[in-house]
């Protein structure tokens, strides 16, 4: 990846992140009248990355490609069984975990977290909202079999079978895409299969079409 220092609005503060270097998959700087047609290809990010940056560019077209992450920094579990003080959950195949001294940790290339924030999804109502996190008040974790975990709690709310929890660190050190001091930009038929700690941010730019 290209590693370039950028200060981006609403990302993690200088106090928490003294080195705001971005790790960039597709980096366009001071270019004019360039079209990149992915013809349906997928740009697969590994680790915490900013998928693309357009800096001081004009007349740029990015089109017909997908952006995805090998191991998204937002992890996911589905509730298979629930008791008063425990959950049994199915871990999504793209979510990596490790258990050390009965403590659960999520990780990927260059990142890890044990706490963070969560949102939950109800399949029946098709509603998603910010919620209690399955990492809160967690006493111990046991792997029943690969990608199926027993989570025991000091206390927990009732959550409901087949509730899906998505968890992430609240640390925003990268964005999904960044357009800076540019104009006349067209983002056409780009599928973001995962938006990381932030979406696409445009700063000091004009005439952006998506």
Q: Where would I find each of the regions flagged by the language model?
A:
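Active-site pocket-lining segments that scaffold enzyme catalytic pockets across diverse folds
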Residues: 185-200, 206-210
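Extracellular beta-strand-rich solenoid/capping regions of secreted or surface-exposed proteins
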Residues: 2-35, 44-63, 71-87, 170-183, ...
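Short, exposed beta-strand/loop patches in secreted or surface proteins that constitute
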Residues: 36, 74-83, 121, 127-144
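Extended Gly/Ser/Thr-rich low-complexity repeat segments
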Residues: 66-68, 95-133, 156-182, 190
């Amino acid at each position: 990846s290209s590693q370039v220092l950028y200060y981006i609005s609403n990302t993690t503060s200088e106090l928490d992140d003294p080195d705001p270097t971005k790790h960039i998959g597709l980096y366009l700087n001071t270019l004019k009248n360039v079209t990149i047609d992915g013809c349906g290809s997928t740009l697969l990010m590994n680790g915490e990355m900013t998928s693309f940056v357009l800096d001081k560019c004009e007349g740029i077209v990015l089109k017909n490609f997908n952006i995805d992450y090998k191991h998204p920094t937002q992890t996911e579990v589905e509730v298979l069984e629930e008791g008063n003080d425990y959950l049994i959950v199915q871990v999504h195949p793209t979510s990596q975990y490790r258990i050390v001294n009965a403590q659960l940790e999520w990780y990927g290339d260059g990142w890890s977290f044990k706490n963070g924030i969560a949102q939950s999804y109800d399949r029946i109502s098709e509603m998603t909202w910010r919620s209690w996190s399955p990492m809160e008040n967690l006493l111990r974790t046991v792997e029943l079999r690969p990608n199926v975990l027993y989570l025991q709690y000091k206390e927990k709310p009732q959550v409901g079978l087949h509730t899906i929890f998505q968890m992430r660190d609240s640390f925003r050190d990268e964005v999904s895409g960044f357009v800076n001091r540019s104009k006349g930009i067209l983002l056409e038929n780009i599928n973001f299969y995962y938006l990381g700690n932030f979406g696409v941010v445009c700063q000091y730019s004009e005439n952006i079409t998506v």
